Amino acid sequence: MAKTVKKSGPKKAKRNVPNGVAHIQSTFNNTIVSITDTTGEVISWSSAGASGFKGARKGTPFAAQTAAEAAARRALDQGMRQIEVLVRGPGSGRETAIRALQVAGLEITLIRDVTPLPHNGCRRPKRRRV
């Protein structure tokens, strides 16, 4: 019988990063929260799908809240205290994700909407008739 060998993968070194930037990408189908340092290197990330939600439930505000809490918890372990929040996209989880970051214990210094707006680019999808 073969012995089971426990592999220890590359562990990310714990760094002390006092302030950073939270990037929240909120679409109609999912919400992705990435917390970076000021240079743009990712400290922690989470998404509604990574938090255990599947299908249509990934687009809900509660899924966005859960994803933001998970990312904030990992960022707090790295020593983060203050963040700027950059929000992108039209999804329903935008405000909930920001509130979850604040409740988790991160001090929000700035909230900026960086949703890209086309200057008459691609044609929009046709209107849904339900």
Curated annotation (Swiss-Prot):
The keyword ATP-binding does not apply. One of its GO terms (biological process) is translation. InterPro entries: Ribosomal_uS11, Ribosomal_uS11_bac-type, Ribosomal_uS11_CS, Ribosomal_uS11_sf. One of its GO terms (molecular function) is rRNA binding. The keyword rRNA-binding applies. Belongs to the universal ribosomal protein uS11 family. Keywords: Ribonucleoprotein, Ribosomal protein, RNA-binding, rRNA-binding. The lineage of its organism: Bacteria, Bacillati, Cyanobacteriota, Cyanophyceae, Synechococcales. The gene is rpsK. One of its GO terms (cellular component) is ribonucleoprotein complex. Pfam families: Ribosomal_S11. It comes from Synechococcus sp. (strain WH7803). Located on the platform of the 30S subunit, it bridges several disparate RNA helices of the 16S rRNA. Forms part of the Shine-Dalgarno cleft in the 70S ribosome. Part of the 30S ribosomal subunit. Interacts with proteins S7 and S18. Binds to IF-3. This is Small ribosomal subunit protein uS11.
